[in-house]
A protein has these predicted regions:
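Class I S-adenosyl-L-methionine-dependent methyltransferase catalytic core
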Residues: 1-178
């Protein structure tokens, strides 16, 4: 895994082998970031199930102002810290906690939110409900959902899907406030 473009282009990212997780592959990440490019510059990013920090770090490389990288797994947090330190990124906050607690307590608004939980979970629907309940998405912001099953990407009537893509065993849906 590596950073595919921007100021950190070509920098290697460490991954990990934790059951139920799988990082977004470089070719899928490249396609995704081509789609969301107009939302990245100067954005405040929340990568809620950050894993290795892959998506949040890519957003920072492509011009995001600040990123919050969240994961509840300590192995993921250690990997994120290693990746951030190896690249020398400073405009990032790494949070080791459960997504529900983070969404309740963070009290920020985001321009770009990544929801890429482990495939064996059903966290997307609850995450979207909490993002809406706590009003965490800026009016022009987007939520990027990734899952192995399109049926797991369930959202309230306050959001609409503006784009969806299928890449092998991955479904990516972009949501925007209505």
């Amino acid at each position: 895994m590596k950073v595919i473009s921007g100021k950190y282009k070509g920098r290697k990212l460490d991954g990990f082998d934790i059951d139920g997780t799988r990082p977004t592959m470089d070719r899928v990440k490249e396609s995704l970031f081509a789609i969301i490019q107009n939302y990245i510059s100067e954005s405040i990013v929340l990568d809620l199930f950050a894993g290795s920090g892959n998506l949040g770090i890519e957003a920072l490389s492509e011009g995001a102002k600040y990123a919050y990288l969240v994961d509840k797994n300590i192995k993921c947090i250690k990997t994120i810290k290693k990746n951030v330190n190896n690249i020398g990124i400073e405009n990032v906050k790494i949070i080791h906690n459960d997504y529900r607690k983070v969404l309740k307590d963070i009290n920020k608004k985001f321009d770009l939110i990544f929801l890429d939980p482990p495939y064996k979970t059903n966290c997307i629907e609850e995450s979207i409900k909490l993002i809406d309940e706590y009003n965490l998405l800026n009016d022009n912001g987007i939520i990027v959902c990734e899952s192995d099953n399109l049926d797991k990407i369930v959202y309230t009537d306050k959001f609409s899907a503006i784009r969806d893509r299928h890449y092998g065993d991955k479904y990516i849906v972009l949501l925007k406030k209505i």
